[in-house]
């Protein structure tokens, strides 16, 4: 059996889409003998601190047992704008974007990932928080990227018959990310004939996979396999289906509503080996990615804004002791004899300017 870890995982921080508690994912991975795992929520990094804290707790126990530590990988499934992140024309397909798995190798990569995600929300939001090639190239250092599900740029273009476009995308990502770019395979086959589930995705995945395997040979790019995990155990599939109804505002019995394949649980190493037995390198390459990732801390002291204090106010401690809100207003609104020289509104403006807050209000 090939060793394997999950690199494409949605927690309950993929709002109204992922259902998995972070702690249950880690517990299942550790119990199954996995050496680590990534979380890659849609467009956000809300779960990284919870993952970091819980892995630290688990690793304390593993150390006491003489076992190797469990390695967290901080990532995000980002949306890459079809053109530029500043473009916002619905009729030209600017809503949403291609999916891309982005993983941080170390603390510098973590900071670059934070930058990408923040800019996607602040500058690129249009239906979804979107990044673009310009930002990916600018902040590419110490990041690992995988081509994602069939909504990723390369598989999406393959399925449209645009092999020239797929090759162009591969060449661009390989130029920017080098050996840290991987082509991703997924297989969500529904085997239960009585289960109500999405059966259209698997044939599309197989079509894309066939070309991805050939392209990996052509360009010398390594393969990885993932499962696009959205819930912890197979038994959670129906509960996850209810969650999708909440997300889309549909009834369970709606014949036209969105369905998942119900294969998106956090599968064991054994289950993933059964599914990808014909491409063992795609399993083992997940460990290559794990070995590229460092253990590092994301803890940080509180970041407080700096407010300059006039010399006549004394030290920060003296200022805190001296000034209550009422005294602060008297300081600005009255003269040394207690006569009012400034209105309340004028005092507020002056205080905001003194604190560097005038641009925020």
Question: What are these model-predicted stretches?
Answer:
Residues 1-361:
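Phosphodiester-processing cores and adjacent nucleic acid-binding clamps
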